[in-house]
Amino acid sequence: MTLLHCWLLLVGHLASTAYADFITKDFKSLPPPAYDTNATQALVPYNAALEERNGPSSSTALLQYIDHKPGLMKKLLAGLSIRFAPPTMKVISTPTDMLRIDKIKNNIIKSSQWKRWARSLLEQNSMQNSHVIITKKMMDDLKPTNFFLVLLEASKDKNTKAVAKILEETQFARWCTIEHESISPMEFYDVLQLNLNEPIAYMERLPVLLRYWKYYKSVHSPMSSVATPKDIIDKQTVNRFGPYWKHTGEIAELLRLDFDSDSFFNHPARNVWLDLMKTYLDDTKTAEPLMIKTFQLLGNAAAKNLQNNVYSPIHFAERWIQANLQPIDVVTILGLDIHDSNLATNSAFSFLKVFIEKFLVNHPEADTTVVKIFSRLGSDESEKALALRKSFVSFFLRTPKFTPKTVMSIFDLTISADYVEKNPVWAIWMEYVNVYLVKNKVCPEGPLADTLEFLGSTAAADGVVRKKSIELLYSSWSGKTSQDTRIKQFLTAAARLNQLEL
């Protein structure tokens, strides 16, 4: 055996002996397992049967996250009523520094530092509820605003989302059950530092505010009934506001919406409010005063073609059509009065106009409410009413399914001297007839031919409205000629009746 072989054998022997001594010494130095003899939270009991029935408690979930035990180890310990105490750690005297509040944009709860801090804190407060003591200490050290910003970051990570939810709900419960610490949702708005001039941050923090509002309401005004969601808008609304989605006045105040100026359109939560309105109106078919104000604001914006607002009437009208609402329902929702002489100038009328057009496409027939609306417009000679009449005429002409016979049916029109003089809707019919004839240069058989024949007859010679109708048609053909027999006959009769020269 060479000298080298002897040397290697000696080194191996010494190494194995030292390792055995180390292992023996290390095991002897370990503390004995801590048995749950006093049922304290320092030694957390684990009842597998109870957890199987009820699911993991929030305390269990929080402790499992802090201890970060592998899944296999949890299975092995599932039938035991003991847990091994975590290794003793040096008490951290400056937990605020440990939480690094100067870097709250990071997910602090995911860090190993936070876990060590939480373990140390629980060791010092073994007789208290784990999530309560952690929540309280974080609130004290971070202060409320930073505390919730930390939880907001943690909620974005699937690994810490559940822990963030536990801590958030724990603080909500403390505020709602400890009288001297109670704060209202309006005060919590300020805690979250919601700023209308910072829309991204506002919308990111708004769900936290709404969760507290729901929690606060559940404690002080418990309710269980919720709407049955019909679409994604309903689902989002119910998710945001819970069973309290009908508390629209309170919600508007909580969001700090301004309905008296165009600043409404710059509010980050404007669409949240509009979605709430859609769900609310589908259910109640009656608008609250703040909703009527909203329609007026949106109507003004649509009239001005302001960016992102011109489509609001379309969105609401389509939803009302899908909900099978009738014209009278929409009139009520918009807070309109079809007998009001200022109906055309009401800014919310733009919503009604869009709805009527979509409604008539699906129901091209007379509707009592629609006929009354056209009659009101026909009797109004204001600039706004004339513009609306012109717009409706254009709509009828560009929509193929609206033949002259269909339009006449929608107006519930009768061609007679008595009807013409007493029904203002005749004015809109004549505007339609005039544009149709000038555009097409022919007069087809049916309502248009009957109208020209009536106007050219002596039976209607003395009517005031009849004279205005003749003048309207005749002036449109000034300097023009037509090869259509009916049109030529009318123009000849019109000149004779009114002593006009062709």
Curated annotation (Swiss-Prot):
Signal peptide segment: 1-20
Motif residue range(s): dEER: 50-53
Compartments, record wording: Secreted; Host cell membrane
GO CC annotation terms, alphabetical: extracellular region; host cell plasma membrane; membrane
Keyword list, A-Z: Glycoprotein, Host cell membrane, Host membrane, Membrane, Secreted, Signal
Glycosylation site residues: N38
Entry comment, domain topic: Has the canonical EER motif, but lacks the canonical translocation motif RxLR, which characterizes most oomycete effectors identified so far.
Protein name: RxLR effector protein BLN06
